[in-house]
Amino acid sequence: MHRIITLISGLSLASLAMAAPPENPVPTGQPQALQAYVTGYSYWDNTPPSTVEISHPVRHRFAGGMGTFSNPVTMAIGHQIIAGEDILDIPAGTLFYLPRLRKYAIIEDTCGDGPSPQDGPCHIGKKGLIWLDIYVDGVSADKVVSDTCMSAITGVQPVVMDPGPNMSVVVGPVTEGGCFIFPDP
């Protein structure tokens, strides 16, 4: 569910609280190329840990997916809790394509914990960009292997919101599938 995010060293809570969130792209049904800060989360560091629970199921009941158009990988997005309502930065069910991973992903989970996730890095973003947190799996892999994969995929990279169905894919979970990373298109 709500994923625990470790604050990046050097950032203070005060600077996070004062930072303005990025202007989030709006799904239109037409492909939109954009840059995003992409991170990964796994079975091992999900909230609660060692589970596959997700907060906003759309295509899956639990975190997972094979990265195809018809079975995209679960992805988390920042969110806000306002007057007790959980508001995602981008609507659940929004589809993305990540060219560096050659995976389709779908918003089905939230990134950020606590009573005010809007004060955390997932909602605030990174370098003025939206923060996308893809589920790298790890159920069948050692924690060190999934952590290494998460570290390898972390960074600013191109993504496509509302992609078409004919993108090149590497089928399988991110970690267990080899954690392949391709050059930017």
Predicted segments with their positions:
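Fungal secretory targeting signals
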Residues: 1-22
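Solvent-exposed, well-ordered loop and adjacent helix/strand elements within mature globular domains
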Residues: 24-185
